[in-house]
UniProtKB/Swiss-Prot annotation:
Keyword Lipid metabolism listed: yes
InterPro entries linked: ClpP/crotonase-like_dom_sf, Enoyl-CoA_hydra/iso
Lineage of producing organism: Bacteria, Bacillati, Actinomycetota, Actinomycetes, Mycobacteriales
Residue numbers spanned by region Disordered: 90-110
Domain of life from the UniProt record: Bacteria
Gene3D superfamilies reported in the protein's UniProt record: 2-enoyl-CoA Hydratase, Chain A, domain 1
Alphabetized UniProt keyword annotations: Fatty acid metabolism, Lipid metabolism, Lyase
One of the protein's GO biological processes: fatty acid beta-oxidation
Reported induction: Repressed by Mce3R.
Protein name: Putative enoyl-CoA hydratase EchA13
Amino acid sequence: MFVGRVGPVDRRSDGERSRRPREFEYIRYETIDDGRIAAITLDRPKQRNAQTRGMLVELGAAFELAEADDTVRVVILRAAGPAFSAGHDLGSADDIRERSPGPDQHPSYRCNGATFGGVESRNRQEWHYYFENTKRWRNLRKITIAQVHGAVLSAGLMLAWCCDLIVASEDTVFADVVGTRLGMCGVEYFGHPWEFGPRKTKELLLTGDCIGADEAHALGMVSKVFPADELATSTIEFARRIAKVPTMAALLIKESVNQTVDAMGFSAALDGCFKIHQLNHAHWGEVTGGKLSYGTVEYGLEDWRAAPQIRPAIKQRP
């Protein structure tokens, strides 16, 4: 069950079932082409679509809405504003409000392990809202396309990687900066070696550098690269091509590829690396006397609050 602004189940004749969304706060949901394409838009542009708990819960509800709709064949995940997503929200007014006890606290901070203490609480919360939900979206019973632009940082990578296909504007950059800014070993859904390659992953995490859309395309991570002013229309045209594929064939193609990658060790590696991620949090919790679950400038890290420039991973530059 998702805790979000989604209305009650509407049971119709002949077993048809749909969910009618009420007003979302952090995302937008709409359908295109007589409902054959669903578009989910991350809608915190001023915060560069940093992911609050409320956004993630609403995103899960929107994915579920599209999955339950038999008319929908393809789901596009996109974003408003200058960036696809700057990662997890680490201290905005919305984030503080959602976390803080009181009438405005988000319900997700009162369940799924939130009431437990110590490492267990963080482990259960991150497993449910950061890790397991991303795995769930990867296996959504629809074909999904991430339409990305601008910065795709850290947890923003997770949202793109859980989609079946990624299309990018020419100005897109991809980076996971949690190593150099938070002293963490990567985000919770550690798809990096599978998406970037093993050595490129080490380079990007150890430096905090980024790669552009063209290099991501060369790696096979990105399917299409479009000019920024053509991204929206070109993505819809791409989705229309895919929507023509019979639904059973499309789903079995997706499952065949996902099961092959899983047989190669993908899911097992994700599970193991999530535990390593939690060990990293526990380390910082001990080092900081329980004050923080990540590192700070005191330990030689970059000040993430200052939003330091992310440099491109150019082969000729140290």
